[in-house]
Every structure is written in structure tokens, then in C-alpha cells.
Amino acid sequence: METLSFEFPAGQPARQRAQVGCVGSGDLEVLLEPGPAGRLNIQVVTSVNGSAERWRHLFERMFAGAEPPALNVDIHDFGATPGVVRLRLEQALEEVSNV
């Protein structure tokens, strides 16, 4: 198991929380809650050691040129593919954006 932390610029805090997926279904759970203004904090707990670069590249592609809401994101991963990770993150971001 490995724990990774990432931080990206963000806008104002989201107004609600979101939970999508679960570790037993699709091997991934994403939890979002409002965070401090201007910061998107992501913590990944993964069963795949040595995957920090893959995660960093995925997040950089997702947030390049965008200003996501300020969030604290917890991701619990048990070997999900990058496509599943992106899908779950997009679902969670859509959920916190719909107020």
C-alpha cells in the first residue's frame, strides 16, 4: 500500500460532498468534500506501489486549463485502470457542481 498526496490550484470551495464508487466495485472509491479556497488537495491510498507518476499525469491532464472547485479528495484504489479513475473523478466533480 502506498499513500500519495497532490495539490493543485482551485477556485472557491464546493458547496457539497460527494461519494462515488466503492473499492469492492470497480476497485475505486472517490470521496470529495469542500476544501480551503484556492486549493485542490488529493490523497490517494493505492495498492499499486510506484504509481505516483501515473497518478500525477492523470490529474495534470484532468485539471490543465480548468479551475476545479476547492476540494479535499480522498481516493481509495485497489488497482483501478486510469479510465475508471477518470470516470469516477468526473462523476464526483459533476455531483459537487450540481447544486
UniProtKB/Swiss-Prot annotation:
Positions carrying O-(phosphoribosyl dephospho-coenzyme A)serine: 25
Pfam families: ACP
Gene Ontology CC terms, in alphabetical order: cytoplasm
Cellular compartment(s): Cytoplasm
Keywords: Cytoplasm, Phosphoprotein
Main location: cytoplasm
InterPro entries recorded: Mal_deCO2ase/Cit_lyase_ACP, Malonate_deCO2ase_dsu
Entry coiled-coil feature ranges: none
GO molecular function, a single term: acyl carrier activity
Taxonomy, superkingdom: Bacteria
Cited function: Subunit of malonate decarboxylase, it is an acyl carrier protein to which acetyl and malonyl thioester residues are bound via a 2'-(5''-phosphoribosyl)-3'-dephospho-CoA prosthetic group and turn over during the catalytic mechanism.
Protein name: Malonate decarboxylase acyl carrier protein
Organism (species): Azotobacter vinelandii (strain DJ / ATCC BAA-1303)
Gene: mdcC
